[in-house]
A protein has these predicted regions:
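Glycine-rich phosphate/diphosphate-binding loop of Rossmann-like nucleotide-binding domains
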Residues: 1-34, 105
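A short helix->loop->beta-strand "cap" motif at the edges of active sites that frequently abuts
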Residues: 10, 37-40, 80, 162-166
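Structural recognition of the beta-strand scaffold that forms the well-ordered cores
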Residues: 40-43, 58, 81-85, 114, ...
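Hydrophobic alpha-helical
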Residues: 32-36, 101, 112-114, 119-180
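Extracytoplasmic ligand-binding site segments that recognize negatively charged/polar headgroups
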Residues: 60-61, 84-101, 117-124
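Flexible loop/hinge segments that line or gate small-molecule binding clefts
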Residues: 38-63, 71-74, 81, 174-187, ...
Length: 248
């Protein structure tokens, strides 16, 4: 798609990079060429190590991970084992959320027994979590780093009848994630402001293309959602953005 944009002479591209490190054809053949030919680049949600973009709108993933880690620490004992189910190895969101999660856990980070990657596939996350529960019979927490990994992990814990023994926390939400929280499987989710992220990304890109002043690095924010606050009005707007959207 990016190489096609270069050939067609497009003015800009909105991109959500899948890999943090720039190695490989995606950077060499696409982003670098686009930059050299004058195509403006806006990164949404994630970014690359090489700073080729003109603007970025994303959650501060270190902050999101740390927020999740601090909450997780309140649920754990000093020796409780923790496993992380992340999404795609090397993508900026996975790298930074895990780093933030470890920071938020503080001394409890030493109890992380393993980190696995589900490649943003529900079924792979479920199977990996099932294997983790079998491998570590004393496991007390599974932390997902995106919606796929979080929901897949929660499915496995629910299927095993282990929701009271193994705490599940994660990042991102969906209708199923909300239902899993209502059913007592999820103890906490850090939810991104995805609607805001996309809206601001398009808005600031238009300002940039019109030669007007625009923000180059925007943190779209996130919130901790628990069974105790999930029906607060502001939290409902994050969980059900289109149900609560008012059009004028």
């Amino acid at each position: 798609l990016m190489s096609g944009a270069v050939k067609m002479g497009m003015d800009f591209r909105l991109i959500g990079p899948k890999q943090y490190w720039p190695a490989g054809p995606f950077y060499e053949e696409c982003l670098k060429v686009a930059k050299e030919t004058g195509i403006r680049i806006s990164f949404i949600d994630s970014y690359t190590e090489e700073k080729v973009q003109d603007l970025t709108v994303a959650t501060d993933n270190l902050e999101a991970g740390e927020k999740l880690g601090k909450f997780a620490a309140t649920l754990l004992g000093p020796d409780d084992q923790i496993a992380i189910v992340a999404h795609v190895k090397g993508v900026s969101t996975a790298v930074e959320r895990e780093e933030g999660f470890r920071k938020g856990l503080g001394d409890l980070a030493k109890n992380i027994v393993e980190v696995v990657y589900c490649d943003s596939q529900y079924e792979k996350s479920r199977k990996l979590t099932q294997e983790l529960m079998e491998k570590y019979p004393n496991l007390k927490m599974v932390a997902g780093m995106n919606e796929y990994s979080s929901v897949g992990a929660a499915r496995a814990v629910k299927a095993a009848g282990a929701k009271d023994r193994i705490q599940v926390v994660g990042v991102d939400s969906s209708q199923e994630a909300v239902q899993l929280m209502e059913n007592g499987v999820f103890k906490g989710l850090v939810v991104q402001k995805a609607f805001k992220m996309g809206y601001i990304g398009v808005k600031e890109t238009i300002l940039m293309l019109r030669g007007k002043s625009y923000e180059k690095d925007i943190n779209s924010g996130c919130e901790l959602v628990t069974p105790d606050n999930m029906y607060d009005s502001e939290i409902e707007k994050l969980l059900f953005p289109f149900n609560t959207l008012k059009l004028s």
